[in-house]
Amino acid sequence: MMSGRDQEPSRYYVGIDVGTGSVRAALVDQRGLLLAFAEQPIKKWEPQFNHHEQSSEDIWAACCLVTKEVVQGIDAHRIRGLGFDATCSLVVLDKEFHPLPVNHEGDSSRNVIMWLDHRAVSQVHRINETKHRVLQYVGGVMSVEMQAPKLLWLKENLREICWDKAGHFFDLPDFLSWKATGVTARSLCSLVCKWTYSAEKGWDDSFWKMIGLEDLIDDNYSKIGNLVLLPGAALGIGLTPEAARELGLPSGIAVAASLIDAHAGGLGVIGADVRGHGLTCEGQPVTSRLAVICGTSSCHMGISKDPVFVPGVWGPYYSAMVPGFWLNEGGQSVTGKLIDHMVQGHPAFPELQAKATARCQSIYAYLNSHLDLIKKAQPVGFLTVDLHVWPDFHGNRSPLADLTLKGMVTGLTLSQDLDDLAILYLATVQAIAFGTRFIIETMEAAGHSLSTLFLCGGLSKNPLFVQMHADITGMPVVLSQEVESVLVGAAILGACASGDFTSVQEAMARMSKVGKVVFPEHADKKYYDKKYQVFLRMVEHQKEYSAIMNGS
């Protein structure tokens, strides 16, 4: 029977997602169905190696463009709420909220240090040497991608043109909600996950003093946030008239406290109603589910009722994704970006492009069908029996938390043909799945109990990537009915802020739906167990090589 809510006239929510290379918006109804979608690329600068920058004004302009597009022709009175998610990039503004440069060139339009920027290596090393108590909530070791090292870098390198003039340091999701409402309140998600804030205790003065950023404590932490809200909480009195005009939305509609993009993906999938799909997690608590948000990089989101401390895995963060639950967040620094890197750098790439274009296929759809062609009688995964990849081309985020690790490939030959490219692509996809297995095993050893993967993000659209995750972890993989789960997650925030649902959990259960379940091929387990042994041995070998080269 349909509930009364489903029979009501449609209520709409807008979700805006700012990814690494584009801004996307969606119009979503109260059942979680995506009714309209728009995307707009955003600018990126790399003035020097490991420095990655964006422009908050360029990002906001793109938000306005895509939002206007998705609400075109819609009855404005039915739009009830707006939710934002974005990468955890750092936005720097002066006391009047104007952009400040985060670069030596003094270009103030480039006022965003991107999440994947690795300029603050020396700073994060010094922060980790303090062994401060806040570090136990980031798996024991802070990442160079978090905000404290980037802030320290700005103070040490751009004192006059940036640091001394700065009035506001925002995580990008919080910048967007401020832009929409004029409210400088921060989301608990960003502050807890990237800024060392504690949901129970607030900021820790001793940490900022110890690392040389005591000036942030001034004026009750006004530069980095002193009003903190749960994700999905309504901000101020809603959308300001100015922002409403720019976005093409009704003034005063509810705007939610934001989420980081991966957390929005987790919110969009982890609460789905799985009844009738033959999954073990059906009768189990939501804590048996692991959401894997896989795009440029991958994030592995597991929640628990009590805090679980996992070495090399971020968290436990209280209420950072689902209110009332502790979050642990594993991750891989490059996944989609690594697959692109391996494929595009191969001598056969131009041939692949030409053949895929001739067939009107994406290069990955073409590669998947090419692998089926060359596999002969064996399962496709067995093509990599002699080719093994260790995927940390950009360091290891989890579970080793070692920025110095490099990528490895063993089993190369003189072959440069399309078969060779396809098999290297397969080995790379498998390596990413083995990395997920490594994270899962580490989380389980620390106290998590996981049975099902919920995949979303760009790579979840690749059937080979999904099947390899099922086969290599031995767990079923659930894919959402809406492939754009991150946007559904952002819309869920807007729905919560509007008051149309009593809780985030209710909105998750109503608005996220199972589309497809991919089960593991258990017959191939022995083969993947062997490959996994090789995988773990590779990193040990890398450490041995380093020890030899760094020895006296």
UniProtKB/Swiss-Prot annotation:
It catalyses: D-ribulose + ATP = D-ribulose 5-phosphate + ADP + H(+). Pfam families: FGGY_C, FGGY_N. InterPro entries: ATPase_NBD (IPR043129), Carb_kinase_FGGY (IPR000577), FGGY_C (IPR018485), FGGY_N (IPR018484), FGGY_RbtK-like (IPR006003). Keywords: Kinase, Transferase. Postulated to function in a metabolite repair mechanism by preventing toxic accumulation of free D-ribulose formed by non-specific phosphatase activities. Alternatively, may play a role in regulating D-ribulose 5-phosphate recycling in the pentose phosphate pathway. Can phosphorylate ribitol with low efficiency. Belongs to the FGGY kinase family. This is FGGY carbohydrate kinase domain-containing protein.
